[in-house]
Amino acid sequence: MAARDLSVIATAPPNRYPIESDIVRFNENIFRDGIQYELQRGGQVFFIHNRVENIHEVAGMIQRLIPDARVAVGHGQMKGNKLEKTLLGFMEGQYDILIATTIIENGLDVPNANTIFINNAQNFGLSDLHQMRGRVGRSNKKAFCYFITPPLNALASDAQKRIKALEQFSELGAGIHLVLIHISE
């Protein structure tokens, strides 16, 4: 089997901006400020929490922080028609914030959603985090990604490397750099 050539698209689509990626601790003030900023400019927010057993508690916290927001919850243990209705409702703008598991990782295109919070980011692989971050920044608005982690010095070294790589390589077309980091591990 021969090696194949690799093609890299190095030019971003017109009017697209890099996703501003930040590593943050679990902090309600950061959540409130980031969500309010996005909602004030007419956008929507993803909040990823990959634990179904307490996802509704997280949704309750977000609803308490932003009482006027229309909050929805989506996860893979929901009945198919209920999940589909929730996701379509978010895509159509019926909800401001979607609290979800990684079910949104692939195939969900919501150009109006330009902020994503990823809770316990240290528990995900590099490609998962890159895919989730890619759910935002699909329009001509600046997008924001918040990787929520414990203090970095409390994380395993491989988790630290993953999170720092995502923060460092956030420009459009950065996927190839992340692949090279992933291969070298």
Predicted segments, located by residue:
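Inter-lobe coupling/hinge segments of SF2-like helicase ATPases
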Residues: M1-K164, H177
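Long, hydrophobic alpha-helical segments
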Residues: A165-S170
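Short, intrinsically disordered, charge-balanced linker/junction segments flanking boundaries
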Residues: E171-H177
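Conserved small/polar residues in nucleotide/adenosyl-binding loops
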Residues: I181-E185
